Structures are given as structure tokens and as C-alpha cells.
Curated annotation (Swiss-Prot):
Keywords: Metal-binding, mRNA processing, mRNA splicing, Nucleus, Phosphoprotein, Repeat, Spliceosome, Zinc, Zinc-finger. This is Serine/arginine-rich splicing factor RS2Z33. Residues 246-255, 280-290 have a biased composition (Polar residues). Belongs to the splicing factor SR family. RS2Z subfamily. It comes from Arabidopsis thaliana. One of its GO terms (molecular function) is zinc ion binding. Component of the spliceosome. Interacts with SNRNP35, CDKG1, cyp59, SR33, SR34, RSZ21, RSZ22, SCL28, SCL30, SCL30A, SCL33 and SC35. Interacts with MOS14. Extensively phosphorylated on serine residues in the RS domain.
Amino acid sequence: MPRYDDRYGNTRLYVGRLSSRTRTRDLERLFSRYGRVRDVDMKRDYAFVEFGDPRDADDARHYLDGRDFDGSRITVEFSRGAPRGSRDFDSRGPPPGAGRCFNCGVDGHWARDCTAGDWKNKCYRCGERGHIERNCKNSPKKLRRSGSYSRSPVRSRSPRRRRSPSRSLSRSRSYSRSRSPVRRRERSVEERSRSPKRMDDSLSPRARDRSPVLDDEGSPKIIDGSPPPSPKLQKEVGSDRDGGSPQDNGRNSVVSPVVGAGGDSSKEDRSPVDDDYEPNRTSPRGSESP
């Protein structure tokens, strides 16, 4: 049985598992032993080698497959497809446009060269006309997008409705907490100003030592909202003005009955000063002075 198989007429070989030290000239020198090499397309760790005769390509594949080259065991086999980006199509496969048309399904031309109809308005996924693949309802990408769009409003609405009351409550609580100390301070200041101790403390010690001022009638006079003097203080002020205690004043003011002869002795015994200051000279206990 012959070794050579010319069913596809392929002249392009795939060379894999190349070493990082391998260069294009090294591959060209190795494969040129089996025939004329037309092109060497070197990649990172693999390459494509093209021969001028399919039989030379088959010989190179047979002898070089699994051989150690440049420190690595390479694999050599026929390539499975037409070359990309090459301009010489004489021995590399079918020319451009020789593939299968997506519009009519016939081999030998592309969809842009198809004369069966408007190929731009046909979907390549479902085969129906009137829309393109991007707008196809059967596209898996569109199904995913539609599912995500249908779910997104539900997800976005639920947390907003639940979070809005809590945010308003938290803001109101924060405002109330920040304002509460100020209100307490204002109330404390008002209570202090209303208390009598605040008025007493505002008076200077010099004003406290001063004796109360008397008006024209002899009664103590209130100055600048100061509290009225106690009955004991009024008694002491009256005694100082008369020049002695209430008892001494009563004794010194008594007039002899000889002077008041011809009149009522009970009325003449009292001095005019005693009549004026009789209410003020009453003791706190309610007993009258002699």
C-alpha cells in the first residue's frame, strides 16, 4: 500500500511544541531536506511550513513527526484549514469567495456576492428574513439581557422603599439629639434667672452692708427691686433714728402731768413722734411697747 495520500493535495504542515530557542532559519534548514520549502510562518511555540509539492510535505511529516529538535520533541502534521492573510492562493486552497454563502447556502461565493436576494436583511442564526442576528429573539445574548432587565427594576425598587423610612427616622433622630442639649441649657438659664437666689447673688456686698433708705414718712424705701427689710430691721432703724431703744424712747418722751394740766393726761403722755411711729414700733411678737 503506498504511503503517499493525495486526497486533499495539502502542502501546508503544522509544526508544534517548538523550543523557545528555535528560529525561522532553523526550521527552513530542517524541512528543506525533503523538498523545496516555499514559506515558513513562525509563531511563538509553533509554526507553519509550506512545500511546493504535496508529496514533499507528506515525506517531511512522516520522518519529522515526534523527532527531537533543538531540545524539544516536535509534532508535524497537515494543517486543517486555509492559510490566513496570504495573497498566493495557487496551491494553498480555494480562492476568496469559494466558501459557503450564508444567504443561499450554496458553495462557491460569499454572502456579499450572492445574487439570490438581499443578504443584509437575513438572520444567520435562525435563517429568517426581516432582521439581523443582533436583533434576533433567539439569540442567547438577548435572552440574558432581557432576563437581567426584567429583574433589575424589582431589585432596585425593593431596597429603596425599605430604606427610605429608616433614613428619615435616622435623620430626625440625629437632629433631635443635636438640638436637645441647647434646649436644656436655655431652660436652665431661664430657671436660674427666675429664682430669688439669682437676685440676691447679683447684689454686691457693698450694697448689702448699706442701711435701707427711708422715705419722707419714715418707712423703709425699696431701691432697684431689692426685697423689703424684715420687721426686725425696721425696728432697729426706728430706734436708731429716735436715739435709743424703743423702751428708752417711750420713757424719755413722756411729758409730766403739770405741763399737760387742763387736758387729757392720757393723750398728753404720748409724744407726737410716738403717734407717727406706733405701727413701726410694734414688736414682731405682737406686744405693744410701753
